[in-house]
């Protein structure tokens, strides 16, 4: 079963989204940072009309839809890769999921606290992405250190080290692993290492009700960013 982690800065609407997705979910969603400490988890069935039609054609008595587990993860702040806030907990929870749903605040409301004191969705995205990049960079450097002695005697270790050097250069420039063009063989190696920025990501914009139909300037910026990154919004 696919596991998707709902992430973002504190107090941007992660638990609200979780409650909307998961039937009978009662995750605490309050107007203050770090409302969520322990991750909330819930399983959602994915409706698919094609599955129902196939079941009808085959007279199946038992139709089981695909399911996704959503994990509402504690908010991340600057310095999370170094353990700030709930950083270590946040990063370990993200390592356990298959995909990331990044919630971004795209509405103005003086009564709703923003940890940065201002609404700037692209800045919010940069904070999260930078921390994930830094966490990957730290993990990569530790991995290279561990295999350093094997490089001269093992072709596999040497091949991995060359790949890691290539990825390290990209991460240092702020480029996520998912954005790097890799061969099928290289992707297999990377998958085993579990880099955070290699996980597929969807940006979920949190809008006022009045902007739900057409979006606003904030959500347009997020959509453009996602398009340039070849991700979904």
Model-derived features with residue positions:
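Conserved G1/Walker A P-loop phosphate-binding module
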Residues: 1-113
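C-terminal-of-GTPase-core extension/linker across diverse P-loop GTPases
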Residues: 2-7, 12, 18, 146-233
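Glycine-rich loops and low-complexity Gly/Arg-rich segments
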Residues: 68-70, 94-97, 125-128, 226-231
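Conserved short-loop catalytic and cofactor-binding motifs
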Residues: 78, 128, 210
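Ordered, soluble secondary-structure elements with a strong preference for glycine-centered loop motifs
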Residues: 80-84, 134, 212-216
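Short, conserved loop/turn and helix-capping segments at secondary-structure boundaries
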Residues: 84, 118-122, 216-220
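Long, charged N-terminal accessory/stalk domains
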Residues: 87-192
């Amino acid at each position: 079963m696919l596991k998707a982690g709902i992430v973002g800065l504190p107090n941007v609407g992660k638990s609200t989204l979780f409650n909307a997705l998961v039937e009978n979910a009662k995750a605490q969603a309050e107007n203050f940072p770090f409302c969520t400490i322990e991750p909330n988890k819930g399983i959602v069935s994915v409706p698919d009309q094609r599955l129902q039609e196939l079941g009808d054609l085959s007279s199946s008595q038992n139709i089981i839809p695909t399911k996704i587990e959503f994990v509402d993860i504690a908010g991340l702040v600057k310095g999370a890769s170094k353990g700030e806030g709930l950083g270590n907990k946040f990063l370990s929870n993200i390592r356990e999921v298959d995909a990331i749903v990044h919630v971004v605040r795209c509405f103005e409301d003086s009564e709703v606290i923003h940890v940065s004191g201002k609404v700037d969705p692209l800045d919010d995205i940069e904070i999260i992405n930078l921390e994930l990049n830094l966490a990957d960079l730290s993990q990569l450097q530790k991995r290279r250190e561990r295999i350093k002695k094997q490089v001269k005697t093992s072709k596999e270790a040497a091949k991995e080290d060359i790949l890691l050097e290539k990825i390290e250069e990209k991460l240092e420039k702020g480029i996520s692993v998912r954005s790097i063009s890799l061969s099928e063989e290289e992707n297999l190696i990377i998958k085993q290492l579990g880099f955070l920025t290699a996980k597929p990501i969807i940006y979920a914009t949190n809008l006022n009700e009045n902007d739900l139909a057409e979006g606003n300037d904030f959500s347009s910026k997020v959509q453009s960013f996602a398009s340039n990154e070849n991700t979904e919004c």
